Structures are given as C-alpha cells and as structure tokens.
C-alpha cells in the first residue's frame, strides 16, 4: 500500500529534487537555486507551504490548464505501466500549453490512491511524470494526496506563460485560411484498439510511444506563435474530427479537409483512426500564409481550408460529405 501521507509527500518531494518540510529550508533553498541556474520559472516557494509562490517572467501572461485522469476511463493498470500513466497525465496539460504557443513552467499534482496500491506503482508514476517534466523544464510545485475508495485518480494543473497578448487562441481562424496538422495522426488510437481486442498483451511502451509516451509539440507551438504563423490553434486530443469542430465553433467558421491529405499513420486504410481516434497530442492550426513543411523537426501537412458558414466537410474519392464529430466524448461513449 502507499506510504502514510507525510512520508509519501516527503518521498515525492525527494523524487522532484526538493525536500520535505522536515528537511528544513536548506533542502528547499538548494532546490530553488538549482532551478534558478537552469532558468526554470521563478519558484519562490514550492512543496512544504500552503501555497506555491511563483514569479512569472516579466511581461508574460499566465496560461493555466487542468486535466483529470481516472483509472478505467483514461488508463488501465493492466495495460499501462505506471511510468506511462505519469507521463501521459503530464503530456495532456503540456499539449494544451503547446496549443497556445506557451512555455510550461510548473505543475501541481493531486492524487487519490486506493489503499491496496503498491508504493512501487506510485514511484513509477512519478518517474514517468518527472522524466517528462525534466525534458520541458517543468517544476513540480505542489499538489495533494488522498485515499481513493476505488481506482487511481490524478488531477494535474499546469501553469505556463506567453508574452502578454500573444497566446494563440481557437477563435482566430478566418475563411480562406489554410488548415494544417503536425506529425501523424491515429497511431495512438490503433494501439488502443489492439489493447481492447486482446491482440496486444503487455506491450513495451518504448515500442509504441505514440500511445504510451506521447511527446507534446511544445517547440512547434512556440515557433508558430513567435513567428505569427498560426491564426488559430488547438491540440488534437479528442480526435481530428472533434477538435476541428471545437476550433471552428470558437472561430464561427466552417472547414473542408481532404482525406488524401490527412497524414494517417499506416496510410489511407487507417483514416478512421486519424479522423476520430484521439490521443494524438499533435497541433491543428490555421494560417493565412504558407507554412514550412517542417517546424522544430516535426512534419507539417496542409489538410484543407477554412470556409464560410459552419459546415465541416470531408472530401474523399471526389465526393464531399459532412464530417461528424466522431472523436472522444466524455458522456455517452465507452472509456478509452
């Protein structure tokens, strides 16, 4: 079972290169100085006080996102190793920050854990979480713990920033803009389908990174914002068909996409996974001008254009049909 709460927090703090309150100010000072040296957001006070105290970069606005992950809905322990669960929990928030062109700064983790959960599982969760956090210079600044009467529950709040007035919103698309996506779509959903069918048992996360260890497009999002290339942007977490509709609704526009242009992992035969699968954590964005074929080492593909009105259509084999939002829906659809 997990350690008692105080000991658990101390263990998490040590994993995050900080110290529990019992270690005194010296450990916390070392932590703060280390992050000052590496240029991470100005953490003035982290784990050990009632609130974290952070200083935003001068002239920046705060970006705040929260994501809730529930066992048997967003992950299953029999399928997902704890390192993958921790990684994926943070990746969801990082992808939101990427979609606004921001820089991630600090994370807060609230965990509810069942009494019978091995401490080794908790250690693995934070190994995955903190490994991804380190990659993007994100500091674990606080959180909460509780006992769960059922499965594992993880709530992640992520703080980021962008120069004031520059964050890329969903509402900036205009008729005539081109539609682009980064990377490939549908690989994560294909792995999930194999897990559900039983064809894939105890897979290696390193062999199927799109599903188990996705990497959010932080650098690409930053460049799209900084160079003013994107007029509107959203991350693809619920599926292209659904997230495209979210963007169009916020902008008050429609869209036309071309099936043969969608970069579906596995080719045209896997198009349905690319359109409706979700968990891609790629970026969907609109642009008024031409965009490079690659940004920050990630491929960029033009898949269509923004149109007047509110209709969203797919052109396939020369035929145009309305594209329904067939991706993830929290109420009324089966768990992932």
Model-derived regions: residue spans:
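Short, low-complexity, intrinsically disordered N-terminal modules
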Residues: 27-28
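Short helix/loop capping segments that flank catalytic or ligand/cofactor-binding pockets
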Residues: 73, 189-191, 244
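Glycine-rich phosphate/pyrophosphate-binding loop regions near the starts of catalytic domains
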Residues: 10-21, 31, 37-181
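Glycine-rich, charged/polar anion/phosphate-binding loops
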Residues: 49-50, 141-143, 164-168, 217-220, ...
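Glycine-/charge-enriched secondary-structure boundary and capping motifs
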Residues: 1-21, 37, 60, 80, ...
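Short, acidic (Asp/Glu-rich) active-site segment that either coordinates a divalent metal cofactor
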Residues: 63-66, 151-153, 167-223
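Short glycine-rich anion-binding loops that position phosphate/pyrophosphate groups of nucleotides
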Residues: 68-69, 185, 239, 290
């Amino acid at each position: 079972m997990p350690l008692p709460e105080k000991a658990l927090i101390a263990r998490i703090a040590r994993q995050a290169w900080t110290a529990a309150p019992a270690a005194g100010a010296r450990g916390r000072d070392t932590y703060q100085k280390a992050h000052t040296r590496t240029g991470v957001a100005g953490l003035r006070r982290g784990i050990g006080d009632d609130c974290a105290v952070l200083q935003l970069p001068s002239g920046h606005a705060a970006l705040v996102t929260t994501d809730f992950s529930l066992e048997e809905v967003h992950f299953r322990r029999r399928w997902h190793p704890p390192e993958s669960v921790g990684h994926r929990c943070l990746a969801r928030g990082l992808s939101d920050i990427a979609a606004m062109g921001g820089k991630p700064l600090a994370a807060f983790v609230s965990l509810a854990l069942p009494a019978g959960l091995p401490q080794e599982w908790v250690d693995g969760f934070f190994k995955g979480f903190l490994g991804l956090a380190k990659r993007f210079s994100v500091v674990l600044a606080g959180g909460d713990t509780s006992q769960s009467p059922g499965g594992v529950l993880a709530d992640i709040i992520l703080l980021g920033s962008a120069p004031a007035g520059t964050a890329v919103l969903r509402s900036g698309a205009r008729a005539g803009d081109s539609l682009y996506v980064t990377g490939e779509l549908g690989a994560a959903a294909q792995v999930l389908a194999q897990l559900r069918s039983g064809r894939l048992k105890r897979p290696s996360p390193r062999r199927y990174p799109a599903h188990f260890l996705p990497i959010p497009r932080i650098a690409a999002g930053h460049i799209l914002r900084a160079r003013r290339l994107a007029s509107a942007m959203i991350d693809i977490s619920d599926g292209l068909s659904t997230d495209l509709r979210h963007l169009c609704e916020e902008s008050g526009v429609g869209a036309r996409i071309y099936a043969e242009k969608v970069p579906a992992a596995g080719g045209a035969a896997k198009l349905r996974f690319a359109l409706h699968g979700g968990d891609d954590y790629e970026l969907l964005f609109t642009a008024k001008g031409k965009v490079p074929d690659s940004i920050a080492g990630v491929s960029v593909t033009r898949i269509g254009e923004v149109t007047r009105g509110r209709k969203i259509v797919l052109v396939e084999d020369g035929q145009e049909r309305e594209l329904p939002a067939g991706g993830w829906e929290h109420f009324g659809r089966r768990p992932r």
